[in-house]
Swiss-Prot record:
One of its GO terms (cellular component) is nucleus. Component of the chromatin structure-remodeling complex (RSC), which is involved in transcription regulation and nucleosome positioning. RSC is responsible for the transfer of a histone octamer from a nucleosome core particle to naked DNA. The reaction requires ATP and involves an activated RSC-nucleosome intermediate. Remodeling reaction also involves DNA translocation, DNA twist and conformational change. The lineage of its organism: Eukaryota, Fungi, Dikarya, Ascomycota, Saccharomycotina. It comes from Saccharomyces cerevisiae (strain ATCC 204508 / S288c). This is Chromatin structure-remodeling complex protein RSC8. The modification Phosphoserine is found at S485. GO terms for molecular function: DNA binding; histone binding; zinc ion binding. Residues 1-44, 510-544 are annotated as: Disordered.
Length: 557
């Protein structure tokens, strides 16, 4: 191999090695830190230039973030039903009904109560309910997660529940009102009434007298029986039938209870069963009012009557006590009494049980007791044998029917009643007379007031007339002074008042009548004379308007 070939081969190897070495050196950045820094600067500069050339679209970025957030939202697992009467609701807007129902958030009364705060709270409550629409959403659960005052939360919660936007399709058994411990019967509550409100119950006292004894026995007071639940009617066939059964067998019996799906009340007599939703039952009231949702119709329900024999007929001590309490509280309002007893008891059951109670009659016992004491019967324990009891009853009836002083008592009673009515009528008549006298006095006082007012008006008119007369005299005096001054100035015209013209006309007429009387040619011919202003006798004639009519004008120069 020649030297030239060697020389040619060596550079080829060197060039190959040279070309392969740079990648190894570029990957080993620690060996050349200054090269890595320069490369990073160049990359950052190129990226900055690319970002400067590209414009950022914020709407697209926000949409991308929303799409990413949608991945973490809870999926809808239950169908949500909105009632037909709340079809105006739109979760993205605030309706006018909401503004009228919650005006605190829309009148700028507080900086914490704004439309945005209302909308956020409303949407949070609705979305929380829609996560589990079959469970009741309470106010406490909302309070724990919403930073708002309690009054506003209660208002919004009540508004949404009223319009069926929340708690519309819940299970009635999840309502807080139905959650509670079951009745065990060991708590007995007795009705306590103040002493002033208790009804008067006459004490059943039987006076006992012992004939032929050394001394009289003390009176024994038999108190009125308050706790009547210990007594039982042994002639009740249904109760006897229930008494024959064992308690263990009664406890094993299954008593079905049908609860209304809408209101949560118990449907006792009649229920409406849904043919499409087999677990849904409605009471008669909710069915008649149409509270069965928008996705059902009335034809989807069938009317079923509960079996009355399945209702529990026997009465417990607690129910008997509640019945007596209800009768004492509500008297003859049997519907309220049945509600007070509760359970499966109807109005008919309460009335039937009350009639079957062995309540004793105090009046008959008083008559029987007095008769027994009169005959010397044994009445220590209040119990009498059959024959003695019949004799006492017959004697009591005869004493009541054969009363000798009945007519006298009736006449005395009627006389007392008539006297009472006469006294009342006299008092009423006296009151009427007194009222009429007061009425007349008030009228007289008003007349006196009117009379004094008239007198004051009369004095006022007299003063005004005097004032006008003085003004007239002063005015005539001024006119005379003016006429004198006009005469001094050789002015032929004079000032004359209208009233003076009338007076001058009257004087002229009087002078003419006087001349006619002297000539014997009087117009009237009566021959009556009268004295004028200057003491001359003037004959009385006709009126001035007929003799010499004149047209008067206001005075002027």
């Amino acid at each position: 191999m020649s030297d030239t070939e060697k020389d040619k081969d060596v550079p080829m190897v060197d060039s190959h090695e040279a070309t392969e070495e740079p990648p190894t050196t570029s990957t080993n950045t620690p060996s050349f830190p200054h090269l890595a820094q320069e490369q990073a600067k160049e990359e950052s500069a190129t990226l900055g230039a690319e970002v400067a050339h590209k414009k950022i679209n914020y709407e697209q970025e926000a949409q991308k973030l929303e799409e990413k957030a949608l991945r973490f939202l809870a999926k809808q697992t239950h169908p949500v039903i909105i009632p037909s009467f709340a079809s105006w609701f739109d979760i993205s807007k605030i309706h006018e009904i909401e503004k009228r129902s919650n005006p605190d958030f829309f009148n700028d009364s507080s900086r914490f109560k704004t439309p945005k705060a209302y909308k956020d709270t409303r949407n949070f409550i609705i979305n929380t309910y829609r996560l589990s629409p079959y469970e009741y959403l309470t106010i406490t659960a909302v309070r724990r997660n919403v930073a708002m005052d309690v009054a506003s939360i209660v208002k919004i919660h009540a508004f949404l529940e009223k319009w069926g936007l929340i708690n519309y399709q819940i299970d009635p058994r999840t309502k807080p009102s139905l959650i509670g411990p079951s009745f065990t019967g060991h708590f007995q509550v007795v009705l306590d009434t103040p002493q002033g409100l208790k009804p008067f119950l006459p004490e059943n006292v039987i006076k006992q007298e012992v004939e032929g004894g050394d001394g009289a026995e003390p009176q024994v007071k038999k108190e009125f029986p308050v706790n009547l639940t210990i007594k039982k009617n042994v002639y009740d066939s249904a109760q006897d039938f229930n008494a024959l059964q064992d308690e263990s067998r009664n406890s094993r019996q299954i008593h079905k209870v049908y609860i209304c799906h809408t209101c949560g009340n118990e449907s006792i007599n009649v229920r409406y069963h849904n043919l499409r939703a087999r677990d849904t039952n409605l009471c008669s009231r909710c069915f008649q009012e149409g509270h069965f949702g928008a996705n059902f119709q009335s034809s989807d329900f069938i009317r079923l009557e509960n079996n009355g024999n399945s209702v529990k007929k026997n009465w417990s001590d607690q129910e008997m006590l509640l019945l007596l309490e209800g009768i004492e509280m509500y008297e003859d309002q049997w519907e309220k009494i049945a509600d007070h007893v509760g359970g499966h008891k109807r109005v008919e059951d309460c009335i039937e049980k009350f009639l079957s109670l062995p309540i004793e009659d105090n009046y008959i016992r008083e008559v029987v007791g007095s008769t027994l004491n009169g005959k010397g019967g044994d009445s220590r324990d209040g119990s009498v044998s059959g024959s003695k009891l019949m004799e006492c009853v017959n004697d009591a009836v005869q004493t009541l029917l054969q009363g000798d002083d009945k007519l006298g008592k009736v006449s005395d009673k009627s006389r007392e009643i008539s006297e009472k009515y006469i006294e009342e009528s006299q008092a009423i008549i006296q009151e009427l007379v007194k009222l009429t006298m007061e009425k007349l006095e008030s009228k007289f006082t008003k007349l006196c007031d009117l009379e004094t007012q008239l007198e004051m008006e009369k004095l006022k008119y007299v003063k005004e007339s005097e004032k006008m007369l003085n003004d007239r005299l002063s005015l005539s005096k001024q006119i005379l002074d003016l006429n004198k001054s006009l005469e001094e100035l050789n002015v032929s015209k004079k000032l004359v008042l209208i009233s003076e013209q009338v007076d001058s006309g009257i004087q002229l007429v009087e002078k003419d009548q006087e001349g006619d009387d002297e000539d014997g040619n009087t117009a009237t011919g009566h021959g009556v004379k009268r004295v004028g202003k200057e003491g001359e006798e003037v004959g009385e004639g006709d009126s001035i308007a007929k003799l010499q009519p004149q047209v008067y004008k206001p005075w002027s120069l």
